[in-house]
């Protein structure tokens, strides 16, 4: 799959004739191939690399799909046998790719849309399988730091007058307070959110409906400000259409994602799908569940079982801050546990990616 195509051309005998195309291959190796500059290979396209006497060639591939359930032992996809040395590559439209073991897909049902391409060997067994974000493992997971960072941005954007003053317009300040209050009511602080999930005052159904899309978040925000002035509504729309800095903890380290648009994330667990160059392609909210029971590779919330990701992150929320920790350091009797799982629609997704421990009263 094409990850990048560089127009920094290579000179051959004084003439610019080649461009570099970076391709993620099913064996897990990323290869760079030089091809004619007139050819076009957009990020995410499926290609095949061949080598002959004239050098390397890159050919585009048409989609070829298959569907079925991966057997428990990872040796078959529906009625089709998987070769013992099968190469499986999960991919995203933004150019990310990663190899997948058959055991990772054990028991997973793949639809035709989950499989972008496959090939068979001389025995008719599938020996290469390219997936379409079927695992969810290519996303980056973490927790969003206190959302007041975004609230303060909304407030400051509405206090300025045309001359840039933030103190000379009383109506502007009033509008600022209304917008900040509206944003804060739909985007609660992390503490409000976590304790609200624990005590049930914030329902999962409401949470999911508000964070399903940026439009849903904007709609909810505008309903809150429906009785306010036109200026407030305009300010809310301006707020939703502008970019933001998302301060997060990822694998225990604080990092900031700068985006040109707002995404429907409020607080707690989030997921980021990056481009091949490392910028943000999209961002989504993880969905929360209160954890009643911890298992070796799963958790239970009521009667529902959720598998945990192998690289699940664990955080302690204490006095307004996140602290990276491990399960062995958490005493479940003293802490309420909130699991955050991905709901992107990945066939082998839906795993708990982040676990947050909140001190009980």
How would you label these PLM feature ranges?
Residues 1-361:
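...the same signal can extend to comparable exposed beta-sheet modules
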């Amino acid at each position: 799959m094409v990850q990048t195509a560089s127009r920094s051309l290579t000179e051959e005998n004084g003439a610019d004739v080649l461009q570099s195309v970076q391709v993620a291959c099913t064996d897990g190796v990323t290869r760079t191939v030089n091809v004619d500059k007139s050819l076009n290979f957009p990020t995410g396209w499926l290609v095949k690399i061949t080598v002959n006497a004239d050098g390397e060639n890159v050919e585009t591939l048409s989609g070829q799909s298959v569907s079925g359930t991966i057997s428990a032992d990872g040796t078959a996809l529906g009625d089709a046998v998987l070769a013992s040395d099968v190469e499986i590559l999960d991919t995203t439209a933004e150019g990310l790719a990663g190899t997948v073991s058959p055991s990772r897909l054990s028991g997973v049902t793949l639809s035709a849309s989950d499989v972008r391409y496959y090939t068979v060997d001389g025995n008719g067994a599938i020996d290469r399988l390219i997936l379409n974000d079927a695992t969810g493992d290519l996303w980056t997971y973490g927790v969003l730091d206190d959302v007041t960072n975004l609230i303060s941005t909304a407030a400051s954007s509405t206090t300025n007058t045309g001359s840039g003053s933030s103190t000379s317009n009383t109506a502007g300040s009033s509008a600022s307070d209304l917008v900040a209050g509206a944003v804060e009511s739909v985007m609660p602080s992390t503490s409000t959110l976590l304790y609200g999930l624990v005590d049930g005052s914030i329902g999962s159904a409401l949470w999911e409906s508000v964070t399903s899309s940026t439009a849903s978040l904007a709609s909810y925000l505008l309903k809150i400000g429906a009785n306010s002035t036109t200026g407030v509504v305009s300010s809310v729309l301006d707020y939703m259409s502008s970019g933001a800095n998302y301060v997060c903890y990822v694998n225990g380290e604080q990092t900031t994602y700068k985006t040109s648009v707002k995404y429907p994330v409020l607080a707690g667990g989030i997921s980021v799908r990056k481009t091949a160059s490392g910028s943000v392609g999209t961002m989504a909210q993880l969905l929360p569940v209160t954890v009643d029971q911890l298992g070796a590779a799963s958790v239970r919330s009521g009667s529902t079982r959720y598998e945990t990701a192998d690289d699940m992150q664990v955080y302690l929320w204490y006095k307004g801050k996140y602290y990276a920790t491990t399960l062995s350091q958490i005493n479940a009797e003293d802490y309420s546990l909130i699991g955050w799982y991905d709901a992107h629609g990945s066939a082998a997704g839906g795993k708990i990616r982040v676990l947050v421990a909140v001190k009980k009263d």
